[in-house]
């Protein structure tokens, strides 16, 4: 396993000073930490295998990190179950429910998170779905490991093109998304959060559907029942 204290936590190349912007990719660790204060510290090792890197994004019910798989020597994405309205971080790693009255909701959400992982594991190799390759529990919460996609969200792509795209460009993105949804629906699973933020265009032009968000909506459904 590489020495984590000398790594850039984005590209995972060796650097002289990880606290300074990376000379290879420009990543600024201090800026990322400031933006996501409840996230795991970069350099944390999960499941004796994955070195946690920068935060890719944080939603109401989870945090997604880029990580380095020390067995495969490759970057992956790891999603952590961390519902921000009912849990907090203790001692830098452990996830703890803030109030006993929310313990049932936390557990219910964790079950839906696990269901999402099991479902996505069925789609390893699908060209338009970021499949799950591994799942594990640690720090009193749950994690799953996904393909790391280097590219831009459809939302960013639209913004970078002046806020609009042509019909042909839209079809080139949405037809693969519909293929992904067809495959997922055939397994009885519903995405329920298809937004430009959750559609990614990789550097080679491939379109991937991300973040099935089952925990978020299932908890909402439970609270209304």
Q: What do these predicted ranges mean?
A:
Residues 139-153:
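Conserved short submotifs of the Hanks-type protein kinase catalytic core
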Residues 154-165:
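AlphaC helix of the protein kinase catalytic domain
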Residues 135:
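Activation-segment/catalytic-loop signature of the eukaryotic protein kinase fold
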Residues 53-59, 64:
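Protein kinase glycine-rich loop
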Residues 173-174:
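Activation segment signature within eukaryotic-like protein kinase domains
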Residues 178-189:
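Protein kinase catalytic-loop region centered on the HRD/HxD motif
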Residues 90-122:
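AlphaC helix of the eukaryotic protein kinase fold
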């Amino acid at each position: 396993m590489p020495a984590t204290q000398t790594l850039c936590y984005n590209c995972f190349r060796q650097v002289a000073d990880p606290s300074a912007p990376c000379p290879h990719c420009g990543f600024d660790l201090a800026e990322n930490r400031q933006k996501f204060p409840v996230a795991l510290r970069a350099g944390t090792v999960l499941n004796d295998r994955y070195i946690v890197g920068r935060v890719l994004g944080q939603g109401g019910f989870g945090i997604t990190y880029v990580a380095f798989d020390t067995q495969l020597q490759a970057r992956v994405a790891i999603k952590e179950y961390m519902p921000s309205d009912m849990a907090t971080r203790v001692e830098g790693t452990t996830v703890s429910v803030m109030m006993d009255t929310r313990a049932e909701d936390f557990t219910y959400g964790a079950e839906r998170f696990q269901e999402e992982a099991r479902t996505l594991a069925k789609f390893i190799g699908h060209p338009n779905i970021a499949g799950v390759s591994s799942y594990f529990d640690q720090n009193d919460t749950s994690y799953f490991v996904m393909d790391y996609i280097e590219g831009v969200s459809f939302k960013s792509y639209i913004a970078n093109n002046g806020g609009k795209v042509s019909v042909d460009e839209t079809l080139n993105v949405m037809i693969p998304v519909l293929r992904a949804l067809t495959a997922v629906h055939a397994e009885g699973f519903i995405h329920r959060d298809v937004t430009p933020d959750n559609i990614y265009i990789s550097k080679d032009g491939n379109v991937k559907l991300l973040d099935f968000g089952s925990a978020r909506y299932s908890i909402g459904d439970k609270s209304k029942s």
